[in-house]
Amino acid sequence: MPRRAPLRVARGSLDAWLLGGLWVCALGCLCGVGMAAPGAGAGAGGSLGAQRPCQAPQQWEGRQVLYRQSTGRYSRALLSYDGLNQRVRVLDERKALIPCKRLFEYILLYKDGVMFQIEQATKQCSKITLTEPWDPLDIPQNSTFEDQYSIGGPQEQITVQEWSDRKSARSYETWIGIYTVKDCYPVQETVTKNYSVILSTRFFDIQLGIKDPSVFIPPSTCQTAQPERMSEECSW
């Protein structure tokens, strides 16, 4: 039965995905049946009845914006997602001058159980063990359908569906995923704990396929990688 780890930040180890400012799922098992709960599903599309999760693309590239409650910050990154080979590459983007902010590249190879953290400026490399199993970026088959609605306005809108890990009409969700009805592209994933949003990730500029598979190959400096994680902040 499909399972979710506790928090969605980077599809695997929570620490690993927090490092990359990515998405991960980390809040236990989903126990829905892929159907609208009582009272749900009456959005823009009206009463939709039973719904089945769509199948998200297996290989794509795009961009993401992640909000972390623990820091109160937003971070941006380029993302290469290869579900077929269970690997992800995250490249921090600089959108504004942030004093003493280090930018990193993250290469997560789940079949090998390792993550490489590479500082963009110096190519200094850390090699970190991934302790959590691969968790694909998709809608688990046992998710609960919440709603269908349109984003945007007249002539410029897209229809999306909202899914969650809510078990019944009387329980609260800890994960919400929004995916397009057409092609099942990820739009947003939100993770909550104790009724507060702790992680929220938006995906955009998605293109199917991996333009350059070599992005998953660590640089030569990783042959002598250190085992400790590097800090995102300057050391001085």
UniProtKB/Swiss-Prot annotation:
One Pfam family matching this protein: Ependymin
GO cellular component: extracellular region; lysosomal lumen; lysosome
Signal sequence segment: 1-35
Presence of keyword ATP-binding: no
Keywords of the record: Disulfide bond, Glycoprotein, Lipid-binding, Lysosome, Secreted, Signal
GO molecular-function terms, A-Z: calcium ion binding; ganglioside GM1 binding; identical protein binding; phospholipid binding
Main location group: other
Post-translational modification: N-glycosylated; the glycan contains mannose-6-phosphate moieties.
This protein's record includes keyword Zinc: no
Location relative to the cell: Lysosome lumen; Secreted
Residues glycosylated per entry: 142, 194
InterPro entries: Ependymin
Gene Ontology biological process terms from the UniProt entry: cell-matrix adhesion; myofibroblast contraction
Positions of disulphide bridges: 54-184, 100-234, 125-222
Family: Belongs to the ependymin family.
Protein's job: Binds anionic lipids and gangliosides at acidic pH.
Subunit structure of this chain's protein: Homodimer.
Protein name: Mammalian ependymin-related protein 1
UniProt source species: Bos taurus
Gene: EPDR1
